């Protein structure tokens, strides 16, 4: 009897060990996917360029948000799309929304108001993508180009696919968040968990 219990315990530990190894391998694959997708720019002619919201300070875009806007402006100037969708609501304590800050920046840089759509209610990536999907359906847009940081792209594209939005990724190359430094690595590791959650559970990856 004791021998049987030891045998059963041994098999259980082996199964747990294999499961742990499998989880580590899968997590490693997700980390690699975040990095690989983040380095692919698949921008092509579309109906709109979407700028994902980020922090702003008193109406002034943060360096992260400004890098996204700079990149979107270059795409707009190349004729990738004639419309900018600027996303992001007010975070706690803000006097203005991320989208409104982005819109002011875009107008100062020559984008006419008629080419700008402001989405200023969302407060998370999930909410932003749902808002983009609603706008795309209402405007009968066939496709959009998503602009954000490299670490963000896999989750955005998975969410877009789940929401039946045809989307192309175009990560900014000038963000102060660099994937190879400590801050960038933290973002990559976080996204390696958030991306599959966004696909499987959606709201859990906010």
Regions found by a protein language model. Name each.
Residues 28, 181-206:
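A transmembrane-helix-recognition feature enriched in membrane-embedded lipid enzymes
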Residues 31, 35-189:
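A structural signal for short, hydrophobic/glycine-enriched beta-strand patches
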Residues 1-47, 206:
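N-terminal membrane-anchoring alpha-helices
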């Amino acid at each position: 009897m004791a021998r049987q219990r030891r045998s059963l315990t041994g098999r259980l530990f082996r199964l747990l060990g294999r499961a742990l190894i499998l989880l580590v391998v899968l997590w490693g694959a997700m980390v690699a996917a975040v990095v690989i997708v983040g380095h692919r720019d698949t921008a092509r002619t579309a109906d709109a360029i979407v700028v994902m919201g980020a922090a702003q300070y008193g109406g002034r875009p943060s360096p992260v948000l400004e890098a996204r806007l700079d990149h979107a402006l270059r795409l707009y100037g190349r004729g990738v799309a004639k419309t900018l969708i600027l996303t992001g609501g007010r975070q706690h304590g803000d006097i203005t929304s991320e989208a409104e800050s982005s819109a002011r920046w875009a107008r100062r840089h020559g984008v006419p108001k008629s080419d700008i759509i402001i989405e200023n209610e969302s407060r998370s990536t999930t909410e932003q993508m749902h808002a983009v999907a609603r706008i795309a359906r209402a405007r009968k847009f066939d496709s959009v180009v998503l602009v954000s940081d490299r670490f963000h792209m896999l989750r955005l594209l998975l969410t877009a696919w789940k929401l039946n939005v045809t989307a192309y990724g175009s990560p900014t190359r000038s963000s102060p968040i660099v994937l190879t430094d400590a801050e960038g690595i933290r973002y990559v590791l976080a996204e390696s968990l958030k991306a599959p959650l966004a696909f499987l559970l959606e709201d859990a990856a906010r």
